[in-house]
Amino acid sequence: AYETGSLPPATGNYDLKWETSEQIDLGIDLRMLNDRLSFGFDYYEKKTKDLIVTGITPSLIVGNTTSPMNAGNVKNSGFEFELSWRDNIKDFNYSIKGNIATLKNKVTYLHETLERIESTTSAGIGVMNYFEEGHPIWYMRGYECTGIDSQTGDPIFKDMNDDGIIGDADQTEIGSAIPDFTYGITLTAAWKGFDLTIFGSGSHGNDVFAGYNRTSRMKANTLKEFYDGRWTTAGDNAKYARSNPSNYDKYLKSS
């Protein structure tokens, strides 16, 4: 005998709501020397609450999964500085402006049933980024590499809990894509209807996932630096681990 029926794939959540943000900005602007010299300073703090997350563990009496819930908070704060000078020499006008901004990002709350949220996975790599309370948003997690074993050519991972075993408990924050600060400069010049603008910008302190030195691409080459700097013989003081196509997770490095 057969029966037909239906059931919801997940429990409903009538309390689900929009994420909200609260922000404060404090600033000072100064202009001197007939507006030729100007200076700006700002402090900002933004708190985003009730981030919508998935993967909440349901009660044992519930037989299906839970719907997305408001279960995460993030805080961003930092300073912004700007200094500029503008002047003219007869028909020639020019200006120079520089700026620098800092950013501190931190997950301040995550639902108590979640230790961390994993990002999407990549083929041959696995999970690369995590969302976890007390860390920058989507930080990089892995083993901290302290060097290359001169006898075996294998990377040496730091034993974070000093138990003599390298395992999941030794994984830690090894990087973040969020920069410590960003900066920029702009130069302008104008003369009798002609003008020129030159600008540049950059960032400092952000980490980049170095997936280009993975050895799982069996039909692709690697960069010359990794080939020349790899361990080859016992006693080598190498910068990179030995080549080993059967074990390609060592490119997930923190050094």
Question: What is the predicted function of each stretch?
Answer:
Residues 2-9, 44-71, 104-178, 186, ...:
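Surface-exposed, extracytoplasmic segments of Gram-negative outer-membrane nutrient-acquisition systems
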Residues 1-38, 66-89, 176-182:
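Outer-membrane beta-barrel signature, preferentially recognizing the C-terminal barrel domain
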Residues 33-36, 88-94, 107-112, 132-135:
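Short loop/turn motifs that connect adjacent beta-strands in outer-membrane beta-barrel proteins
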Residues 24-32, 37-45, 79-87, 94-102, ...:
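Membrane-embedded beta-strands that build the outer-membrane beta-barrel scaffold
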